[in-house]
């Protein structure tokens, strides 16, 4: 992205902005695709999570299969530091020691990491890049959905830039400055460009334009718990 401040694409409505997408049935069908190890050392375990797999097990017995439960079979000391949405694929990091967990947790809490995602969205933005500033909170009557609320929401900021324009579809690189649940999905929906294949926030045409959520955690840059040096981990986008 350029050094100039990106355009502010914040929704203009200052009141709560819920999603108007009707609830869709959900059946958990975790993929057989194995969790791939990107990097392993005495402090970090960096993985490539497949789309459709929960990061941690859910309460129902049928939601037990998850990245965490699969990984613990081979790496019993690994602990979850952050999560990716079930349908999001890509880079996720786990800690191998208590000290590493604290170190990584503080980086997430204080927003010291750098994350970038790839998404394919419905429509073609007029600009080549932009910034979305739109506070978010739970949409309590419709959980697990989230919503934008300028009065009661928590700060949420997303930068985006166009990578490629197709016919009626655009490939974006997304750089979140905050880590709210469903942030990228809700922010893009709010400016009229829902992510393709999104069962929670996309209208029917955008939902059926892809066979999975078109959102991928491509790059995670962080300070290594061992010595504080910057390290970057990447998982190539599968779509």
Where is each model-derived feature located?
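RNA pseudouridine synthases
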Residues: 2-239
